[in-house]
């Protein structure tokens, strides 16, 4: 009897009972009861008829045929719509609906924020589709928002913004901008009443438009009488460029009113701009409007505990700063950072946390593998000779809740022999998909007459009674059997053995443990894989062989298997992966997390860094472990409907459980893993209930990958770039406000929703301590007695050169430097660098210094650099008499005339490049020195190993880098995305999306030579995790996980770089016997190369250049050769200045070059190196510290401030000097330029006096760009090739441009009378050009297509005797057919017969 309370206001239209399947369907009239009443009625029926398998209430819809009928029944339409679109209920309850014409309705949201949420949820589309599908009513539905309601919302937003401003202490400019945007204000033209259209709807057919949005790029270009204002604007549907000309007066107003981030409404004409090649808006009217931003208006705020930044490789969009800034704007007190398997956002998050006052919960979403899965589940004491039932099932799908068994196959084993079989189809009473039919070969015709599971399962359990159940991946098969048994009131008490887990422990060398892999390994036939009977038989045969193996290792019973085998380490690289959220509770937890990450990368990496569960258990102190997303253990267990005991074990591992919006996981419906949105909700309800049952906090998390709903387009682009076919079906992984999250979980009930959304996440945030990802302070390594050793080495060398006592100028300089270096704790750096350089020199390799280390006399005297920073001076090598020239008459000592010692008559040494120490370490000596050293590329690995010897293994790591999407790569991703979809968008939209994708992490790498040194009393895990670069598994290189910039000032970084110059010098010394360090730097012939080719004895016309610097490092490029032609340097000092000018950015072009051409200043007066700025300003009487600060800012491209300009003018600094400072983006220190020029000059000396050695060395180093075909053709062949490449201009490929440089040097060599000979199989070296009487003999690897390994193989094998045939050559060298064909082509094998066999005729 149905109670009267249910029958009130309800009309039961129809009742249908299916006896065979025990299903009841009740059809009731639509709108007869609300959702709660229907739910209560459903519960009543389920309690009244417990034997029924399924009870369904179907609501019959009345006919709605007009707009009026829809409006009349709107409240009930909303209720019915909310069953399909749950989130719509909260939206639509607050909205008004109205008729607009015959077939149109408007749904008015009370505020813009609700309108935005409804729009992003595509609610208009949902209503339209619902009315069409349910009532066959085609209506247009438009979402609008109430201006009156918006005013109220705006006031709340304004108050919230003001409160946030106070908390995060915005600067005055920011406050001005905020106040300006609080109300609409006309800036140009007149006020606009017309309704704005979406930018995506702007087309060539559009004439005058009104649009509104956010400016994301702006530029003012000053012309003769007007200013061109150009800006890009977006409303997140698309973007467009806007242009207008302004008067000077309007420009002065607007430049302070609008900027990037300003929201405006505007009107203008849509025109095609030929210059832009796109539609633009010619601006007429412009109005400031309040920012249209999502805000969190809830009094109590949530905390997001699962969020990804752009450090999740090509997967998430926002930077850590953007996330934390948004949390601050919304009033959230904390936010978690949980990137995929990395913590590389931590350093940035730490800085942003300080700036915005938001607590960062540091964490990570890891990839966990359960390395403790038991092989046997249950208590059986059975002997290995006992009974086992090996079985397999086929099903309609993966869910044991929604899917059914369609076949069971089983084999009984006793005494390791098959004694019985069981096989049957099962009628599932639901359709079998084409996918399952294709997989298993089972279709509906094969099962339609089969028995039901109710009949089959008891028989199977009887067959298996008392036996150990055996299956491959038993979790799946057994969970199905137990789930169906439970529905039938049956129990399954058998012990279970999983052959998948057993094989992992017994046969660890297999590539994987799939059934077909095992069958192949054991030579077992598997004829019809994915048929239960065949799979069971194959598994049984495999299992019998495994039983034999178990007995071999001494196992006699089933109960021993776990205890013996689980002691063995399983290969975690072959285990299934689950996601896990790991949050850091305290500093100890942070260190543990760093070690977990490091070990997961170094020991357990396979496609991703894997974390064994046992490792996490061992190191979980100070960590809070969460169950993560749908790829987490808990969610997977519920989808698989695991039995309660296993579920309990899984849940008890976690500190808290996560539930996420159903939209995040709707893709599981498409995959067939769950049936409906309702089932996803049910899983979340179940997780909530389990949390209550096992006393675990349950938190609602967003799995955030982008900030706003419309930002999903960035992730679509990223996913498409990675090749995902479903890239456009993005789940709504945006950062939700408290209201949005409460709305998502309203189905849990108001109290439970508040608990999971607000209370529990805040509880976790409260127990998390303030953690520092990188410790405060500096942690230099310690070398006992470093201070004394540095002082000793320095003074010994100084006395050796300048005598004892030292000249006052030397003594004062050394005292000042040593005090600064030692007192600031930098002696260790110097001692390390000294040891490295000393070892390299002992091993026969010169070391070039880089950067400003040459500014330090201590560095010179300790042997770190050859650059002497003292003023120009003479010093007698015999009696130590010295004379210093401090009147500025010479730029460097090398340029002074020769002079003999007045005391003993010995020719004095000339030295000194006049470089102030302050450039290196500041006036207080507290600027951290950066010692960069150029080692030979051949020697660099040895230098790295020596560093490890000095500090110990585990204390020296390569400096890590993070490779992000550069703007050009990001542009390529965006363009490709739209091209693949045949979509055309405005160039501004391409620009916006490119900007949004730029900076997202793509890979990791290593600094070319940087190493980080950890002091012996510290662990690397106190600072950073470690890993291999670019996830490479085949390298021994270990880098810091954090980008090395993040560790700057914390750990010592040594730059041990590889460079060609020391390699070149070493080869030249070996070929000539000349000691490069003794080459005179004032050699006249060598100096002449920088202005003419006279010393080379060739015609400049034929060479194509009037200077002789081809092939010289730093001076051989076309750009620098042109500088030499313009400046005509005759002194070493001028070469140093040219080096500085040529290596900077915007230092020569459009700057010094114009100043010299216009006669404003000379080469000696322009800014050529950063030192020039500081020294010139000091000479003008400016404060030393301010001069140093200006130099530092200018060399970094920051220019000078207005206040600094006024100070410079006050001291008589000319305008050209100030303007030059403003243009510079980057520039060399003088010491760097000096070191480069010294190396280049030495190589130039060899070019003049040892031409064969010079060219042999040059081409050896540039062998990759060599083309033997062209050069063997002689001068004319080379000239033709040069002309062809030059004719291509900018269209020449990088390879052709590199070849051009090589060909120019080759032409010069021919003009000097030196030729190339052909490659010789027996005489050519593997990789070096050799000097012979006939000319230069190219190496084997100079042949295009013959790699270095093939060349070495040939060179090595010919040492074992001559080749007797091509067959013999092939067999002995093992080179490819291609290499043999290339050697034949060049005549290298012409004397060899094809075969070893002799012919008698």
Swiss-Prot record:
Top-rank EC class of the record's enzyme: transferase
GO CC annotations, alphabetized: cytoplasm
Record's catalysed reaction(s): DNA(n) + a 2'-deoxyribonucleoside 5'-triphosphate = DNA(n+1) + diphosphate
Domain Exonuclease span(s) in chain numbering: 388-543
CDD domains per record: DEDDh, PHP_PolIIIA_POLC, polC_OBF
SMART domains on file: EXOIII, POLIIIAc
Predominant localisation class: cytoplasm
EC annotation from Swiss-Prot or TrEMBL: 2.7.7.7
Subcellular location: Cytoplasm
Biological process annotations from GO: DNA-templated DNA replication
Classification via SUPFAM superfamilies: AF1531-like, Nucleic acid-binding proteins, Ribonuclease H-like
MF (Gene Ontology): 3'-5' exonuclease activity; DNA binding; DNA-directed DNA polymerase activity
Cross-referenced InterPro entries: DNA_pol3_alpha_NTPase_dom (IPR011708), DNA_pol3_finger (IPR040982), DNA_PolC-like_N_II (IPR024754), DnaE2/DnaE/PolC (IPR004805), DNAPol_HHH (IPR029460), DnaQ (IPR006054), Exonuclease_RNaseT/DNA_pol3 (IPR013520), NA-bd_OB-fold (IPR012340)
Role played: Required for replicative DNA synthesis. This DNA polymerase also exhibits 3' to 5' exonuclease activity.
Similarity annotation: Belongs to the DNA polymerase type-C family. PolC subfamily.
This protein's name: DNA polymerase III PolC-type
């Amino acid at each position: 009897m149905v109670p009267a309370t249910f029958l009130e206001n309800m009309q039961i239209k129809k009742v249908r009972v299916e006896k065979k399947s025990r299903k009841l369907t009740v059809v009731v009239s639509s709108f007869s009861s609300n959702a709660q009443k229907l739910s209560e009625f459903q519960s009543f029926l389920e309690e009244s008829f417990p034997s029924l398998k399924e009870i369904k209430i179907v609501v019959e819809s009345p006919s709605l045929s007009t707009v009026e009928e829809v409006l009349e029944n709107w409240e009930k339409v909303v209720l019915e719509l909310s069953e399909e679109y749950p989130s719509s209920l909260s939206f639509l309850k607050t909205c008004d609906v109205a008729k607009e014409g015959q077939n149109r309705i408007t749904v008015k949201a009370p505020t813009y924020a609700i309108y935005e949420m409804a729009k992003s949820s595509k609610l208009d589309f949902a209503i339209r589709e619902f009315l069409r599908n349910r009532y066959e009513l085609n209506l247009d539905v438009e979402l609008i928002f109430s201006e009156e309601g918006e005013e109220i919302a705006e006031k709340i937003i304004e108050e919230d913004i003001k409160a946030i401003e106070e908390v995060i202490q915005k600067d005055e400019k920011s406050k001005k901008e905020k106040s300006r945007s609080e109300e609409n204000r006309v800036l140009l033209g007149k006020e606009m009443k017309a309704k704005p259209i979406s930018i995506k709807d702007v087309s060539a057919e559009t004439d005058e438009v009104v649009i509104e949005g956010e400016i994301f790029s702006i530029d003012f270009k000053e012309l003769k009488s007007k200013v061109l204002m150009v800006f890009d604007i977006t409303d997140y549907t698309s973007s467009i460029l806007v242009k207008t000309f302004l008067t000077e007066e309007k420009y002065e107003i607007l430049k302070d009113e609008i900027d990037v981030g300003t929201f405006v409404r505007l009107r203008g004409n849509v025109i095609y701009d030929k210059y832009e090649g796109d539609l633009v808006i010619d601006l007429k009217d412009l109005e400031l409007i309040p920012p249209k931003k999502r805000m969190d208006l809830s009094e109590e705020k949530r905390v997001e505990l699962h969020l990804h930044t752009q450090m999740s490789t090509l997967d998430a969009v926002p930077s850590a700063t953007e996330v934390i800034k948004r949390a601050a704007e919304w009033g959230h007190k904390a936010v978690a950072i949980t990137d995929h398997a990395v913590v590389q956002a931590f350093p940035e998050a730490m800085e942003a946390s300080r700036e915005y006052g938001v607590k960062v919960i540091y964490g990570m979403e890891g990839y966990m593998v359960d390395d403790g899965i038991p092989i046997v589940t249950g208590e059986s004491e059975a002997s290995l000779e006992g009974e086992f039932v090996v079985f397999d099932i086929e099903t309609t799908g993966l869910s044991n809740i929604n899917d059914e068994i369609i076949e069971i196959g089983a084999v009984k084993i006793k005494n390791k022999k098959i004694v019985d079989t069981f096989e049957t189809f099962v009628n599932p009473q639901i359709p079998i998909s084409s996918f399952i039919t294709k997989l298993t070969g089972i279709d509906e015709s094969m099962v339609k007459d089969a028995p039901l599971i109710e009949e089959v399962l008891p028989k199977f359990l009887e067959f298996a009674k008392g036996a150990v159940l055996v299956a491959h991946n038993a979790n799946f098969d057994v969970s199905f059997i137990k789930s169906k048994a439970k529905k039938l009131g049956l129990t399954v008490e058998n012990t279970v053995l999983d052959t998948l887990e057993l094989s992992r422990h017994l046969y660890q060398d297999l590539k994987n443990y799939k059934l077909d892999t095992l069958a192949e390994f054991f030579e077992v036939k598997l004829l019809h894989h994915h048929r239960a009977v065949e799979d069971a038989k194959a598994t049984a045969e495999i299992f019998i062989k495994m039983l034999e193996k178990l007995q071999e290792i001494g196992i006699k019973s089933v109960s021993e298997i776990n205890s013996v085998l689980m002691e063995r380490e399983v290969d975690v690289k072959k285990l299934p992966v689950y996601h896990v959220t790991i949050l850091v509770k305290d500093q100890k937890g942070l260190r543990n997390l760093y070690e977990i990450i490091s070990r997961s990368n170094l020991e357990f990496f396979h496609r991703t860094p894997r974390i064994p569960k046992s490792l996490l258990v061992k190191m979980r102190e100070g960590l809070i472990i969460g169950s993560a997303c749908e790829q987490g253990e808990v969610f997977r267990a519920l989808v698989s409907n695991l039995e309660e005991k296993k579920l309990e074990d899984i849940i008890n591992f976690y500190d808290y459980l996560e539930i996420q919006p159903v939209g995040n996981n709707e893709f599981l419906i498409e995959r067939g893993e769950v049936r409906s949105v309702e089932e996803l909700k049910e899983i979340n309800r179940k997780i909530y209930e389990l949390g209550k049952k096992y006393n675990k906090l349950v938190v609602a998390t967003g799995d955030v990958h982008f900030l706003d709903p419309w930002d999903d387009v960035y992730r679509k682009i990223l996913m498409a770039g990675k090749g995902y076919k479903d890239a456009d079906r993005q789940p709504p992984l945006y950062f939700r406000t408290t209201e949005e999250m409460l709305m998502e979980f309203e189905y849990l009930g108001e109290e439970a929703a508040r608990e999971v959304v607000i209370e529990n996440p805040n509880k976790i945030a409260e127990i998390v301590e303030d953690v520092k990802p990188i410790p405060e302070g500096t942690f230099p390594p310690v070398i006992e007695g470093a201070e004394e050793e540095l002082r000793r080495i320095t003074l010994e060398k100084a006395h050796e050169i300048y005598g004892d006592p030292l000249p006052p100028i030397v003594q004062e300089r050394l005292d000042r430097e040593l005090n600064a270096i030692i007192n600031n704790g930098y002696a260790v750096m110097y001692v390390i660098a000294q040891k490295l350089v000393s070892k390299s020199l002992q091993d026969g390799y010169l070391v070039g210094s880089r950067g400003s280390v040459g500014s330090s006399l201590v560095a010179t005297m300790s042997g770190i650099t050859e650059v002497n920073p003292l003023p120009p001076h003479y010093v007698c090598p015999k009696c130590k008499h010295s004379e210093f020239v401090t009147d500025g008459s010479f730029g460097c000592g090398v340029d002074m005339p020769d002079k003999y010692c007045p005391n003993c008559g010995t020719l004095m040494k000339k030295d000194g490049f006049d470089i102030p120490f302050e450039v290196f370490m500041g006036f207080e000596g507290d600027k951290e020195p950066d010692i960069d050293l150029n080692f030979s590329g051949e020697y660099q690995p040895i230098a790295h190993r020596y560093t490890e010897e000095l500090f110990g293994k585990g204390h020296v790591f390569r400096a890590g880098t993070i490779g992000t999407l550069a703007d050009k790569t990001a542009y390529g991703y965006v363009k490709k995305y739209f091209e693949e979809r045949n979509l055309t968008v405005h160039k501004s939209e391409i620009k916006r999306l490119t900007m949004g994708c730029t900076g997202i992490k793509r890979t990791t790498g290593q600094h070319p030579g940087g190493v980080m040194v950890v002091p012996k009393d510290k662990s690397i895990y106190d600072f950073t995790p470690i890993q291999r670069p670019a996830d490479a598994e085949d390298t021994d290189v270990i880098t810091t996980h954090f980008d090395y910039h993040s560790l700057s000032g914390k750990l010592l970084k040594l730059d041990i770089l590889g460079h060609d110059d020391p390699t070149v010098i070493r080869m030249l010394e070996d070929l000539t016997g000349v000691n490069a360090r003794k080459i005179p730097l004032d050699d006249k012939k060598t100096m002449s190369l920088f202005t003419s080719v006279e010393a080379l004895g060739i015609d400049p016309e034929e060479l194509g250049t009037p200077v002789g610097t081809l092939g010289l490092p730093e001076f051989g490029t076309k750009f620098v050769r042109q500088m030499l032609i313009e400046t005509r340097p005759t002194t070493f000092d001028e070469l140093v200045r040219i080096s500085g000018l040529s290596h900077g950015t915007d230092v020569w072009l459009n700057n010094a070059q114009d100043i010299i051409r216009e006669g404003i200043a000379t080469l000696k007066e322009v800014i050529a190196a950063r030192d020039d700025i500081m020294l010139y300003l000091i000479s003008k009487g400016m404060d030393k510290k301010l001069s140093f600060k200006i130099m530092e800012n200018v060399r970094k491209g920051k220019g000078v401030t207005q206040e600094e300009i006024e100070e410079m003018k006050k001291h008589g600094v000319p305008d050209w000097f100030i303007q030059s400072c403003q243009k510079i983006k980057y520039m060399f220190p003088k010491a760097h330029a000096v070191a480069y020029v010294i190396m280049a000059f030495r190589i130039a000396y060899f070019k003049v006096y040892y031409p064969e050695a010079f060219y042999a060395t040059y081409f050896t180093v540039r062998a990759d760009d060599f083309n033997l075909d062209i050069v063997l053709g002689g001068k004319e062949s080379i000239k033709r090739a040069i002309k062809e490449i030059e004719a291509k201009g900018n269209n020449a490929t990088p390879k052709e441009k590199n070849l051009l440089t090589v060909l120019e040097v080759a032409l010069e060599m021919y003009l000097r009378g030196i030729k190339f000979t052909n490659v010789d199989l027996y005489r050519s070296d593997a990789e070096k050009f050799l000097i012979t009487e006939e000319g230069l003999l190219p190496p084997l690897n100079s042949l295009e297509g013959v790699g270095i390994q093939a060349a070495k193989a040939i060179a090595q094998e010919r040492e074992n005797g001559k080749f007797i045939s091509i067959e013999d050559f092939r067999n002995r060298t093992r080179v490819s057919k291609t290499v043999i064909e290339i050697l034949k082509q060049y005549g290298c094998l012409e004397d060899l017969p094809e075969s070893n066999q002799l012919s008698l005729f």
